[in-house]
């Protein structure tokens, strides 16, 4: 509030630094990013802030890779090692929930590792994929399915998981990426009109919440519009042709073969 850009807080373990920061967050009342140097500390602070701010949206944003091996080439043995990665779906869901919370609420606190400094989807692109469903409005069902697919949702009429949806008669069920407890959003329609939007447990039938309006956010944090994807494909193809030409002109047949 005094216009200071930086404030250093020193103290040994157990001296109440987290509690002090929590009081600052409460007084400033702004969206907050708490950046730490590893996942272990991030998990610890995430739990502590959840206890200190039970009514705020406290989120967790760390790297979603359980394993990552970048591509490499060993000239001596002419060995090419392809890129390999294993992603953690639960952490991916938490990352998406964190991004959605920033767009939806002003009382968001995100505890993050250094993974948060790397670029994500263009915020404007991400916002363009967000849309609302309202009780009483008329919808074009095919257009709704298209919007869901554009937002990276996958249609699965058998097994519902975060980031999927299914259609059964006049009922559309969607599992937002931020739902981790097995709940679904069920949209009841009569013809093209939305009659009811509820959050329920599909196994017990228990209704958790009734909505008049429900926002649909992208299923993944790296979501882009069709237009941006088409633009990227043109750029990628142009760069491919440029590199192929370079390798051919310099007699690098092996590199040319790999790209082709």
Q: For each of these PLM feature ranges, what is it?
A:
Residues 1-260:
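ASCE RecA-like P-loop NTPase motor cores
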């Amino acid at each position: 509030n005094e216009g200071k850009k930086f404030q250093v807080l020193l103290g040994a373990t157990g001296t109440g630094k987290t509690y002090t920061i929590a009081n600052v967050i409460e007084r400033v009342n702004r969206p907050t990013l708490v950046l730490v140097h590893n996942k272990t500390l991030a998990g610890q602070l995430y739990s502590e802030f959840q206890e200190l701010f039970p009514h705020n949206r406290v989120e967790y944003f760390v790297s979603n890779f359980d394993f990552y091996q970048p591509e490499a080439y060993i000239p001596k043995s002419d060995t090419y090692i392809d890129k390999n990665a294993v992603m953690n779906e639960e952490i991916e869901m938490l990352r998406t929930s964190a991004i959605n919370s920033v767009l939806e609420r002003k009382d968001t606190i995100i505890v993050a590792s250094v993974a948060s400094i790397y670029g994500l989807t263009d915020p404007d692109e991400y916002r363009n994929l967000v849309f609302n469903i309202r009780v009483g409005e008329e919808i074009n069902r095919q257009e709704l399915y298209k919007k869901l697919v554009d937002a990276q949702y996958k249609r699965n009429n058998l097994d519902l998981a975060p980031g999927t949806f299914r259609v059964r008669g006049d009922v559309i069920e969607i599992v937002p990426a931020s739902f981790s407890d097995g709940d679904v959003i069920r949209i009841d329609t009569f013809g093209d009109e939305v009659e009811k939007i509820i959050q329920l447990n599909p196994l017990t039938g228990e209704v958790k919440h009734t909505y008049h309006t429900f926002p649909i956010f992208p299923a993944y944090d790296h979501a882009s519009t069709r237009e941006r994807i088409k633009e990227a494909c043109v750029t990628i193809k142009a760069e491919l042709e440029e590199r192929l030409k370079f390798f051919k002109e310099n007699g690098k047949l092996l590199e040319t073969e790999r790209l082709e």
